[in-house]
Amino acid sequence: IFTDVDCGYCRKFHNEIQDFNDLGITVNYVAFPRSGLDSVSYNKIVTAWCSKDPKSVLTKMKQGQDVQLSICQNHPVEAHFLLGQKIGITGTPAIIKSNGELLPGYLPPEELLTRLN
């Protein structure tokens, strides 16, 4: 799932991640700061990726909590963003099925399960 820490529907999806997992849906995030590589959103998601506990920091950010920005050098965020652009991602969340099909936007857990099958 291509995600942005400042995307409202990405936050909704993240808050329901346990519901997706309970249905057997595995969620893997790919960073896609919609505002680009020279943005606060980019710095936020890099901070999460570079932290000692990325899941916890990402959750705090998606809950709107302030987190001290800290940028490291070895992270995949730029590569994720460029991949998203290359395959035509224009918004988030953007769900990529295992067969490569794009499901743009937020889908509730039960609907996503149906669309994945």
List the predicted regions and their residue ranges.
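Short hydrophobic alpha-helical module
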Residues: 23-26, 51
